[in-house]
Design a protein with these regions (language model features):
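Non-catalytic alpha/beta scaffold blocks inside enzyme catalytic domains
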Residues: 2-270, 327-330
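Long, low-complexity segments enriched in small/aliphatic residues
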Residues: 257-330
């Protein structure tokens, strides 16, 4: 299960979790709706694209927490009521315009997330808009493409499990009665909680394929040698499968990738953004419209175990908080 914070992300709807256009579409957009996100914190590079588009005349609208995004925008409230109004008016003020919706984790990570997403989907259809989903975990889209999900939500999956293999997940407190095997590169919360630790390579110490927030598979190459007893993560999984008498059918990285490309062809399309089929919206009730959207991240510098183990990142985080506090006082 990869959907931490109980993120309501439907695995059969790639157009929703990976978007309908690449990030570069921001530059051509005339109207941008940001929903449940602070892109300045969650993705500064993407936020710079939004600012560039705004400087060229694009209209930016924010639905969610009021934030300093470095550019002007219309704040359309903290809930989905305004979207429903636009739907009822059939989007008449936005006809024949290039409209882009940027979804943040604030819309996914709520108890009624699936229903709230139906509001957004209906909104997109009404405006004939394009959509980009902004994820805060580098492995999220790739894990979704691998169908790395359970039949239940994240919390329920943890609750009914006795033994948990935790692969680099440090943002969730696992109950003490669970037996935890932790696989990761840095001694963060997950490692401190673990009963068994399997030291894996950091992303810079092994080759890998990452699928970014727009659904583009990207190949990364090893930049430096591993440290201590760390092993490449694919090799750890392979060795563990052998110990559990369910040996996986590959012996090296080439064999693994051949199997990966055969079963999940999307990973073979390196550096390409594939078009995704749109799943039509379903009906929603009015109850989800009044629920306020909350941003998930507030500190860009401490969003993952590698960043949290860095003295430089800790200093930047401290300085950023001081600047924010001074702005509040003034």
């Amino acid at each position: 299960e990869c959907r931490i914070f109980n993120a309501c992300i439907p695995p059969n709807d790639r157009a929703l979790y990976a978007g309908t256009v690449p990030v570069k579409a921001i530059s051509d957009s005339e109207i941008i709706f940001i929903i449940g996100s602070n892109p300045r914190v969650e993705s500064p590079v993407l936020n710079a694209r939004i600012r560039s588009s705004w400087l060229k005349g694009a209209e930016v609208n924010l639905i969610g927490e009021n934030s300093d995004l470095t550019y002007g925008y219309n704040h359309l409230g903290t809930n989905l009521i305004e979207l429903d109004k636009i739907i009822k008016n059939k989007g008449k003020f936005y006809k024949n315009r290039k409209v882009l919706i940027i979804l943040g984790q604030g819309i996914f990570c709520r108890t009624d997330g699936y229903e709230a997403l139906e509001v957004v989907k209906k909104f997109k259809e009404t405006l004939s808009a394009e959509l980009i989903s902004l994820h805060v975990a580098a492995s999220r889209v790739g894990a979704m493409d691998l169908n790395f999900v359970s039949d239940y939500d994240y919390k329920s999956t943890v609750d009914w499990s006795d033994i948990i293999l935790n692969i680099g997940m440090d943002e969730y407190d696992i109950p003490n009665e669970k037996f935890v095997i932790y696989q990761g590169s840095h001694g963060d919360r997950g490692a401190n909680r673990a009963d068994v630790i399997l030291p894996g390579c950091a992303f810079s110490e092994e080759s890998g394929i990452f699928v970014n927030t727009e659904g583009r598979p990207q190949l990364s190459l090893k930049a430096c040698e591993k440290i201590g007893n760390a092993r490449e993560n694919w090799a750890i999984i392979r060795a563990l499968s052998e110990k559990l008498d369910c040996t996986l059918e590959y012996n090296n990285l080439d064999e693994l990738r051949k199997k990966l490309f055969s079963e999940y062809p999307i990973f073979a399309t390196l550096d390409e953004v594939k078009s995704n089929s749109w799943v039509k919206s379903s009906k929603f009730t009015k109850n989800c419209l009044k629920v306020d959207l909350k941003n998930i991240w507030s500190d860009h510098y401490l969003t993952n175990p590698i960043a949290r183990s860095s003295n430089i990142m800790a200093t930047l985080s401290k300085n950023n908080k001081q600047i924010s506090n001074e702005k509040v006082k003034s």
